[in-house]
Amino acid sequence: MIAKGGRGFVGLGVLATIAALPFEKYAAVGLGAFTVFLAIMFRDPKRTIGKGIVAPADGTIREVDPSKGLVSTYLALRNVHVTRAPIPGVVEKAEIIKGRHAPAFARTSTKNQRFEILVRTEIGQVRAVEMVGAIARRIVPYIEEGQSLAKGEKLSLIRFGSRVDLFLPVGSVRIMVKKGQKVRAGLTQIAEVPDGGLE
């Protein structure tokens, strides 16, 4: 399945490949390969939702800071780029903020274009910041303010590689992932509530 916001790119790739085929086979092969790349990039696989607080994005954990409740995930080009709600709640803020396009792993990336999400949950306010990178140019939101979210529900599509910073309520959760760990959105448990909630 292709994610909403990526279908047009894949469709154009298919049409361009077909159009080029009668005239330039090498170009058609190149366009076909690029279309396959786009289909992989914008894939939206079904997920079994995991226990506890789950990862908001596919990728690699780049930073963990329990003192801030921070879990930061870097998305490479090969990763699924559909983000998901790590915890159920109500959306209090869902805003695209314009900014730069520095590499997503750079310190200056905090000033990049981003999608800021605040969710009111039973354990307190959870904040997610989805940032575009040097290649990622746009975030396609799937949610709006006032909306109730189920755990694992789709939040957005980030077009190409990027980063997601998740801020959990300090003292309310125990972070369970480490820097360098691979995670999958909606599936990998990244934190737990000490009293055993959010199963």
For every predicted segment, state its role.
Residues 1-199:
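Contiguous, well-folded functional domains in the mature portion of proteins
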